[in-house]
Each structure stands twice: as C-alpha cells, then as structure tokens.
UniProtKB/Swiss-Prot annotation:
Residues 58-173 are annotated as: cNMP-binding domain 1. Residues 1-29 are annotated as: Autoinhibitory segment. 3',5'-cyclic GMP 2 binds at R473, G482, E483, A485, R492, T493. The active site is at D664. Residues 799-853 form the AGC-kinase C-terminal domain. Belongs to the protein kinase superfamily. AGC Ser/Thr protein kinase family. cGMP subfamily. It is found in: Cytoplasm; Endoplasmic reticulum membrane. Changing G360E: 55% loss in cGMP-mediated catalytic activity. It comes from Plasmodium falciparum (isolate 3D7). This is cGMP-dependent protein kinase. Residues 418-517 are annotated as: cNMP-binding domain 4. One of its GO terms (biological process) is gamete generation. The lineage of its organism: Eukaryota, Sar, Alveolata, Apicomplexa, Aconoidasida.
C-alpha cells in the first residue's frame, strides 16, 4: 500500500516551475519610505534583533559576528493604528521584527491572529520576491525593525566573500599546502570551520592525539611545552599541521590568552574533500614532474595519473646509494618528493635534484639501455620510482614509441564530433584499424569530384587543399581531412595534394569504420552532421504545430522548406524578458547553448531575432519529457534509474568541466530522443561561474540548501539536484516539501527536514547514494570533492553499470516512444492571435541591449 500511495503522490505532482529572484523596486518599498525613521539602536534592541534573526530560517547557519553585522542593517519603521504594513498577493521585499505595539494578520480578508513584541514576519521575502501570503495591519500604534531583501542578501554576500578570502589567505600561508593546486586550496578553504575559544580555554593539549589544524583568525594564544611558556601566537599563526598528515601526539599545549577565533580543518573532512593529504601532495609533485618530461608530456592525463598511482614511493636516509649503476635492474625513472639527491655519471657529479625534479627520460625511451648513472641521497628523502612494470601496467606494453603514436591518434580523433563519444573499445578498434601510406610531392591524395571512402590524418609533412584549381590552405602534422567520407557517399568538395616529398598519412576506410560503428550511434552521428551542415534562414522555415509553451514564449515544430529537415524553434517574447528583467540571462542562455556540444544536451543550430521575439533553432527531440516517462514506467528499477541518472550525470559533468552551473535540473527539463536517450534542455537558469554565484534561481523543490542560504554556491547545487531526481526515480514523491506549495515551507524542509525512505526501498546502495548526494554540507556531498563525478561513478550503486556503453548508445533505454510525443499540442491560430495582440502595446525596450544576439 505504501508503494502505491507514494507512486500516486509522485504521479499526481504538478510540473514545477523555476523562479528568478530580482530586487526590482516594489510597491512595498515605496510604502516603507513613508514609515522610515532614523533611530539609534539600544543594546536591548540589538539583543532582541539578534534573538529573532537566530530563529530565522535563512540565518540559522550564521555565526554571532554575522548576526551582529546583519542587525546593524535593520531600519526603524513607525506605524499608526490601522496602517497597512504588507498586503496579501503583492510582491514582498522586507522582513520585519515587532519592536512595540500589536499587529493583526489577515488571510483572504479574515483575521487569523495578532502578533506582539519580538514576533517576526516576512521571512520569505529575505529569500526572493514572492507574493505575500497574508495582509498585516497595525492594530495599535507600533514600531518595527525591518531589513530589505537586497540589503540582506548583499550583506550575506559581502560577509561570505570576506570570510572566504580571509580563510584563503590563511591557507596560502600554511607551508604544508604549498604544493596544492588553486582548486585544491579552494576546496580546503570551503571546508574551514570557525571555532571560538574563551580566554583560558585549552585549544590543544600536549600528548593528546589530534587530527585538526588551527589558524588564528582573531585573538591570541599561548604555547606551552612541559608547562613552560614558549611563545604567544597571534592572528595568522597556525599550529597542528602535522595532525593532517600523521597520527601522532601533540607536541605542545596551546591555550587561548583572550577570546580567540580559529579557522579549523580536520583530517576526516579533509579526506572527504581532498583525499589523504600526503597522497595528494605526492601525486601533485609526481604529475607536475611528469608533465615537464619530454617523454611523459605526450601521455594522456589518465596515463599520468595511472603512473602516479603505480609508482613505488620509498624513504631513504642521508648519504645512501638509492640507485647504483651496477645494481639497477628495473627502475627507469625517479621523482624527488622530499629532500635532495645527487646525480653521478662515471663517478662524476653532474647535478643535484630537489623536490619536484626528476630524471630518466633516456631510460624510459630505450628500456634495454643499461642504467649508467648513480643516484645518492644528500639528506633524508622520499623518492618515487617508476619501473618497467609500472610502465607496462600503465601503457599495456613497453613500447613507448607505439604508445605515443597511439596517444597522438586518439587526441586528434577525440577532437572530432563523429569520434568524440565512441566507447573506449570502439576507439581502440578504430585506432588499430589505421594504416600508413606515403606520398611524394605533387601526388593527389584525394581528387575533387570523386566519391571518397577514406579518412586521413597527416603523420608527417604538408598537403595543400585545392578547390577549382585555387589553393585554399595548407595542412600539416596532426591535421586531418576526409572525415565525411566515413558517413556519406558524396563527391569530394576539394582536392588534397602532397606539398613535399615523403608525406606520411594515417588512414582508415569507410568499410572498416562501419564495422566498428553501427546501430543507434551511427544513426545519431548521421543526423547530427546533416543538421549542422544545413544552412538555414528564418524565411525558409515553415511552422507545423506548437509543441511547447512556457513563461517566455512557445516552442514550434518547424521544417526547412528546401531540405525538409525538421527543427524545434523556441520563440522567446522580448516583452516578457524586459518585464521580468531577464536581459542578461537571455544573452547568457544564447552564449552557453551555442557552445554546448554533447549528445545528451540539446544542440543549437542558430539564433534569429525580430522586433518581438528571440528565436532559438535547435534539433527536434521527439520522445517526450522524462517527467512523463517516469510516470509511465512507475517506480524505476535500479537498472532504469542507473540509465537515466547516468545519462544526466554525463551531461552535467560536461557542463561542470566548462565551469557552467545548470541550476534547474529536474525531469521537466530533460527530453527523450527517438532512441530513448536523454537531452538536457532549457539553459535559462544556467551560468558560467569562476568563483561563486549568489542569485536565488531554480525550482524550489530541487534547490540545494546553499542556494537558499545566500552565502554563495557553485556547481555543487547540481549534485544536490541529482539526488532529488534519483529519489524521485526510486521512491516516487519528492524528498522535501512534496506536499507543499508554500515556498517558505519547501525551503524550511530542505534546510531542516529529515530525509526518510519508504519501506519498499531496500537496496542499500541506492539509499546510500541518495543520502550522500543529499548531504546538506556541500563539502561533504559526494561528487563535490576534488575527484568530482568520479566518486559518483565509482559508487556501488553503479557497480554493474557500463558507462562506456551508455556513451556509445549501446544500452537499451527503459522507454522508447512508439510515436512522436511533445509537451504541448496547441492550435497555431491561437498563438497567432496572441502575437497580434502583442503588437498593440509598445515595447519598453532598451537601446541596443540585444545587439549581439
């Protein structure tokens, strides 16, 4: 019964709409100007304000200093008996605390309660510009403390930025973090926890085992060793860094000399966010050293990571022969992780290597060459040794030249759309199928007008592209040509002629390619290339029907009259964009959508504009919404959930690699193509982020806690939304606020509600992944560590899942629509009538804001 009830709840939920917070001037702002009075806050005022703010949902995670800062921004308002304070249905922008008097609350013109001193109202207005759920009128003369949303959220942003920058400065000063990357240091900064100590309170005690690093942000602390005062630490000092690396007793006692605040980092949280610090530091050193090598810099990133993982790390005392020319057997390369070593050739010193330096390129390139050097430690040191076995395990063989050759081919073909999403197996088969051919100066490699069947990559030399006897350009090493011949039987559009002697090319024949690439992937590639090749103008499009409708306009099914190729045309009303102040968002949506190039993300063909609309011409996706699909399927099986969640992960991972946060992930924004594979659509909420974003945007039920709290967020918010989607797939309803329409109550449940699971959900791996995706602390959320999506892909939930086959379209989707399915089917005449009405009102447009559209 519980399963049926929850399935019913999930099926009955309405489609959820995104919200955009903005700080436009409202009627409420105008009203408050008439009641504002200047008044200095007394200590009892500040105490009351602080108490009220601490009980406020949005302020629940703020520390005392942040609460005090916000208190200082509260303004004083005076009302006479009968004065209106806020009105039900109007957009709100203030949060209030009653200082004196009584205020009546009305819902739908019915009085429901009276509030007095210390009570607060308008909490939702601090989050975004939602409509007021009640009217409040002064019953008696009274006064309020109030703060405007824009001031409140700007203050939160300022406090958050200041705190992050200050903590990051402290992190930069800790020597143990010197070898970390910028991204890794930012991860640690986000993991900092502020701890306050009273004067005389012990921070760490000599002899105790510790796992926390402390950095003094405020105050002073005294260091004692064996009860003897050694020194006083001040702001910026740090202690306990060895606790992050080693499990050993504290070497001193440290006591707060005055009220002291410390930024603290514990080993457990650091391991979650970054991994074992010592391992990370050594891996960074090894990777950087390998990238400096003339040999290893030609390896792929994955191969370098594998080498770092398989390298043997050893400690050596001072004055020790680490490698002797007469005794070395399998070691081919060394990297100094700590300390210094001296390098000898024929007993003559030829140099000193310190941390981060490496040696051995010649022995890697020619592994049969005897080791002629001796390496001796000058001090205690730690060395990474790369052996023949390490190289063989990493590369699959000991032939370095062949491996570099393979890497070159792979890096070239992965740049091309038709090869980019091949499975590893398909990619390997394709590369193995390449053959080598040579040409002399003046030889025709391909002839204009002939039907081609080969694809070429230039291994060495130069060729000329000639069309109608006119030289167009010259191609050189690692350039390619003729790829269309693998998909289409069509004449070559130009000739390719060898420019010099001994031009070497790798080539593969169409017959071989078609043996490797078959079925859904081949069909997908053919359609994608054909769509991109077609040149489309607005007047060449003819509308067939309306297939979607939203806040800003409609989506039409159109066809290109010359070629009959069908597309989707998203028509966005300029009036709606201007009225809702979304000019920057629509420009950003165009920029992001134009750059996207992934099989699980909607493909933009081009954009148009006229006096009334912006137009996005995209590929046509005919399989309906995932929202409807999961209702047809019922509660998803594990394999079905793996398919859909895995597909969404690949799309979101692609965006995050480009520093794009999507911010509105939900089944309504995912379509299914005719093969049953996903397409992520609608980038109206997406944003490119370098640091952190602060705007409240997205669909409330899918919003991460950090979006609501207003202290800054990044790509972690999409990981939270993955957890909401997975819960919906497996459990039925939404995990937070499923039965709520009041946005404040939805937000309250997201921030404080308990995550529970129906009794019929028994798979422990599924439950564990949902819990870890829906971790309220972003730094503890799976997928948000330095490993990124790898941690999610490696989770036991996906233990039997083939990611390679998913990317290669070799899996059977849970649902393939038997006919074309769209979100809407609206009569075209109805839309045309509305468009005609639109002409009657002039646009309040800004000059040239859309000039680049």
């Amino acid at each position: 019964m519980e399963e049926d009830d929850n399935l019913k709840k999930g099926n009955e939920r309405n489609k959820k709409k995104a919200i955009f917070s903005n700080d436009d001037f409202t009627g409420e702002d105008s009203l408050m100007e008439d009641h504002l009075e200047l008044r200095e806050k007394l200590s009892e005022d500040i105490d009351m304000i602080k108490t009220s703010l601490k009980n406020n949902l949005v302020c629940s995670t703020l520390n005392d200093n942040e609460i005090l800062t916000l208190s200082n921004y509260m303004q004083f308002f005076v009302f006479k008996s009968g004065n209106l304070v806020i009105k039900q249905g109007e957009k709100g922008s203030y949060f209030f605390i009653i200082n004196s008097g009584k205020f009546d609350v009305y819902v739908n013109d019915k009085k429901v309660k009276t509030m007095g001193k210390g009570s607060s109202f308008g909490e939702a207005a601090l989050i975004h510009n939602t409509q007021r759920s009640a009217t409040i009128i002064a019953e008696t003369d009274g006064t309020l403390w109030g703060v405007q949303r824009s001031t409140f959220r700007a203050t939160l942003k300022q406090l958050s930025n200041r705190n992050f920058n200050e903590n990051r400065t402290f992190i930069d000063s800790v020597s143990v973090f010197d070898m970390l990357t910028e991204a890794q240091k930012n991860m640690i900064t986000n993991a900092c926890v502020i701890q306050n100590f009273k004067s005389g309170e012990t921070i760490v005690k000599q002899g105790d085992y510790g796992d926390v690093l402390y950095i003094l942000k405020e105050g002073k602390a005294t260091v004692y060793i064996n009860d003897e005062e050694i020194r006083v630490l001040e702001k910026g000092s740090y202690f306990g860094e060895r606790a992050l690396l080693y499990d050993e007793p504290r070497s001193a006692t440290i006591i707060a000399k005055e009220p002291t605040a410390c930024a603290s980092i514990c080993r457990k949280l650091l391991n979650i966010v970054l991994g074992n610090l010592q391992v990370v530091l050594f891996r960074n050193i090894m990777t950087e050293a390998l990238q400096q090598s003339e040999i290893f810099k030609q390896f792929s990133g994955d191969q370098l990571n594998d080498l770092a993982d398989t390298a043997i790390v050893r400690d050596y005392p001072a004055n020790y022969n680490i490698l002797h020319k007469d005794k070395v057997k399998s070691v081919k390369y060394i990297i100094v992780l700590e300390g210094k070593v001296e390098l000898f050739l024929d007993d003559t010193s030829i140099g000193i290597l310190s941390r981060g330096m490496s040696f051995g390129d010649q022995y890697v390139l020619n592994q049969k060459q005897p080791f002629k050097h001796t390496i001796k430690s000058l001090e205690v040191c730690k060395i990474a040794l790369i052996t023949e076995t390490c190289l063989a395990d990493c590369l699959g063989n000991n032939n370095i030249d062949a491996s570099i050759d393979y890497n070159n081919k792979k890096s070239i073909i992965k740049k091309m759309y038709i090869f980019r999403y091949l499975t590893d197996k398909q990619c390997n088969l394709l590369i193995e199928a390449f053959r080598t051919t040579r040409y002399e100066e003046g030889d025709y490699i391909i002839q204009e007008g002939e039907v081609g069947s080969r694809f070429y990559i230039i291994k060495n030399g130069e060729v000329e592209i000639v069309k109608n006897k006119k030289r167009l350009r010259t191609l050189g090493k690692n350039d390619y040509f003729g790829e269309r011949a693998l998909l289409y039987d069509e004449p070559r559009t130009a000739s390719v002629i060898s420019k010099v002697n001994n031009v070497e090319c790798w080539f593969v024949d169409k017959s071989v390619f078609l043996q490797i690439i078959q079925g859904p992937m081949l069909a997908h590639l053919e359609e994608r290339i054909k769509m991109q090749d077609t040149k489309v103008e607005m007047d060449e499009l003819e509308t067939e029907r309306i297939i979607g409708r939203g806040t800003f306009g409609t989506v039409k099914l159109v066809h290109h009259k010359p070629t009959k190729i069908r597309y989707a045309l998203k028509c966005v009303s300029k009036r709606s964009i201007i009225n809702l102040n979304q000019q920057n968002n629509i420009k950003l949506e165009r920029e992001i959508t134009a750059e996207n190039d992934h099989p699980f993300i909607i493909r933009l063909v081009r954009t148009f504009k006229d006096s009334k609309y912006f137009y996005f011409l995209t590929e046509l996706v005919t399989g309906g919404e995932l929202y409807d699909a999961i209702r047809k399927l019922g509660l998803l099986s594990k394999s079905q959930a793996q398919f859909y969640l895995g597909s969404i992960i690949l799309a979101i991972e692609y965006l995050h690699e480009r520093n794009i946060v999507y911010r509105d992930l939900k089944p309504e924004n995912i379509l299914l193509d005719k093969q049953g594979y996903v397409k992520l659509i609608d980038f109206g909420c997406a944003k490119k982020v370098q640091g952190r974003a602060y705007t409240l945007v997205g669909t409330p039920h899918y919003m991460a806690p950090e979006v609501i709290l207003g202290k800054g967020y990044g790509c972690t918010v999409d990981i939270w939304a993955l957890g909401i989607c997975l819960y919906e797939f497996i459990c039925g309803p939404l995990p937070f606020g499923n039965d709520e329409e009041d946005q404040l109550e939805i937000f309250r449940d997201i921030l404080t509600g308990q995550l529970t699971f129906p009794d019929y959900v028994t798979d422990t791996d599924s439950i564990n992944l949902m819990k870890r995706l829906l971790c309220r602390l972003p730094q503890g959320r799976i997928g948000c560590s330095i490993n990124g999506f790898k941690d999610i892909k490696d989770h036991p939930f996906f233990s039997n899942f083939n990611w390679d086959k998913l990317a290669g379209r070799l899996l059977d989707p849970p649902l393939v629509s038997k006919s074309e399915t769209y979100a809407e089917d609206i009569d075209i005449k109805q839309i045309e009538e509305e468009d005609a009405e639109d002409d009657e009102e002039p646009l309040n447009d800004e000059d040239n804001w859309d000039i680049d559209f």
